[in-house]
């Protein structure tokens, strides 16, 4: 049979068919481009050159080119992933649990209002890790969690502060996409706990802010409630309008504490 560029294109597409790769054929230049769907990085194959090799080596020529393209694309993908970081992100418990039907995200419970997801961050963009991506990365869920928490501890933090009616409010807003993630840095929380004299209240109304407050009176609780609601309404990626009292590594939603206070007050009146 006579081999043409179009037939060679079909042969290579059969050999290199993978769900994560795309093909683009330029019939004028007789070039087939194979590229990664996510990154758009790829390889251009000049088909007349492959046809010339096929005239001499037949099937072996196709095998060699397919092998070269496959190895090059896999190497690009590994290089891309090695440059990427895995970081945790905080989301509301109402956030979707699946990327698509049958492909759940990797998640960890956090509080009654929040859940931890995991992002593969390549500086320009990030993608939440689901089971299919986990398999491509060749990692276990435990490895992802450990890597993410380690990287979360390396995130810098510098708070702005404001004092109202004796209550001090600390704001973190770097806009790096991971401000709320700092709530997972246990050493940061412990260091703040040491400098706080009243109740330590923490809020993550949306992904680009972390609020830590030193609450010493009821006015402080009213202020943090209003503040959290305002930030929640304005956030690009809202998380929760509730704030939490932090004590001994636990987060207790404020509305639960308020209910408990009301019950106690009721008993005392009776």
From Swiss-Prot:
<dbReference type="Pfam" id="PF07285">
    <property type="entry name" value="DUF1444"/>
</dbReference>
<comment type="similarity">
    <text>Belongs to the UPF0354 family.</text>
</comment>
<dbReference type="InterPro" id="IPR010838">
    <property type="entry name" value="DUF1444"/>
</dbReference>
<protein>
    <recommendedName>
        <fullName>UPF0354 protein BCE33L4443</fullName>
    </recommendedName>
</protein>
